[in-house]
Every structure is written in structure tokens, then in C-alpha cells.
């Protein structure tokens, strides 16, 4: 199963990205699961889960922990995520 994470602090963008992902994978036979995070901190606090994601959508401009910082932490735990 393909594991997808969406991390954005604005729900409107989360919903849009989610709909694009659902539309794309809905047309294929690929099984997938999407997890949503509303901050970089919320995403990175679950370090044990960071290793499971195959695709990660990150917002660059987030408060507290921006997308670049979030990506740096993600890479420490999951160098294979895209």
C-alpha cells in the first residue's frame, strides 16, 4: 500500500491536494492511504511514522517549523520519501 502524507497549515490547500491525490489514485489499481498534518511540528513529532511514507506533500511556508526544516527532519528518518 502506498503511504501518502500531506502537511500544510491551511486546510483549504490540504483539501485540494487530497482531492488531487484521490482523483489520481482513484483511477488506478494502486491501494493508498493518506495522512493529513496541519503543521510541520505535528508531522515530525510522529518520528516512528516518518519511515512509512512514500510520498510527502509539504508546504514551504508554515509557522513554527517550515517545510524546509520539516523536510530536513524527514530525511533523517526516511531518505526514500519523495
Where do the protein language model's features map onto the residues?
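Extreme N-terminal starter segment of soluble prokaryotic enzymes
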Residues: 1-4
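Conserved acidic carboxylate
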Residues: 8
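Two-component/phosphorelay signaling modules centered on CheY-like receiver
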Residues: 11-35
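Acidic, metal-coordinating helix/loop segments flanking the phosphotransfer/catalytic sites
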Residues: 36-55
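Acidic catalytic/metal-coordinating carboxylates
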Residues: 39, 65-69
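Conserved phosphotransfer cores of two-component systems
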Residues: 48-51, 73-80
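Receiver (REC) domain active-site loop signature in two-component systems and cognate sites
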Residues: 62
